[in-house]
């Protein structure tokens, strides 16, 4: 599942609207919509705010690519 789908699904399960999530995170409605539709490139700070409100844990995985 992609991150936008996961965020939308969790928001829906919690009975929150996009506007609710916008209010709780203090992010604009436009940002919430763009994150859920995976348009643009949200910052780590933005994803942390959303994850915090939705009760999700944000895990970052770093892979080393041989050059």
Identify the residue ranges that each predicted region occupies.
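Absolute protein N-terminus
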Residues: 1-3
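Conserved beta-strand edge residues that scaffold enzyme active sites
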Residues: 25, 64-65
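Small-residue (primarily alanine) positions within well-ordered alpha-helices
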Residues: 22-25, 51
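Short basic helix-loop element that most often maps to the first helix and adjoining turn
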Residues: 5-23
